[in-house]
Amino acid sequence: SLIVSSDLYKFTNTDFFNDHEYFYIYRPQHKLTYRIVSVYSYDDRHIMNSFDFDDDKVFQEYLDYIQNPRSFTKVVRDNSELTINDKIVTLSTCLNSGDGRLLLQGVLIKDELTK
């Protein structure tokens, strides 16, 4: 299903979040299936410029945060344990009020070859 940035807010509703466990990214000859781990509000820092993901300890700390974000707006899927071997993707949109971002985090669970 197609997710546009305005759709990300739907995932802050616990029922919607629980009813929509996966999203898909299509690449040439690949269908990538991601399990949604969490959605939460975050500040406006550029994540890739703010963390040294080459450092395994820093990356694991970030993954731990994804699973337990310090945010008033958050929904987290139970039984999601992320490790530095996981491949994650972040979908992001502006917050409706103030500075910051709404982030949806997914973990790759399947990479299917397509024709």
Predicted regions and their residues:
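Extracytoplasmic/periplasmic soluble domains downstream of a signal peptide or transmembrane helix
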Residues: 1-115
